Amino acid sequence: MNATIFAFLLLLNLAMHNATEQSSETDMDDTLLIPEINRGRCIEEGKWCPKKAPCCGRLECKGPSPKQKKCTRP
């Protein structure tokens, strides 16, 4: 019985390890790190970006005119 439980736990561990490897295969250009988002001094994606505060992380301030600029991904 102990061997059965051990085998079950081993298979469960392997399954969880494979699931975490697959979920961590994201492109770093498409993700922002949490400290970059919640810095407080920067503007998040989709928000209006005045000259006073920069956009967070790799976001850029883009728009058709200076008054209509928003923080967007490059």
Curated annotation (Swiss-Prot):
Disulfide bonds join C42-C56, C49-C61, C55-C71. Belongs to the neurotoxin 36 family. 01 subfamily. It comes from the Eukaryota. Residues 20-39 form a propeptide. GO terms for cellular component: extracellular region. Expressed by the venom gland. It comes from Chilobrachys guangxiensis (Chinese earth tiger tarantula). The presence of a 'disulfide through disulfide knot' structurally defines this protein as a knottin. This is U4-theraphotoxin-Cg1a. It is found in: Secreted. Residues 1-19 form the signal peptide. One of its GO terms (molecular function) is toxin activity. Keywords: Disulfide bond, Ion channel impairing toxin, Knottin, Secreted, Signal, Toxin. Probable ion channel inhibitor. Its main location: secreted.
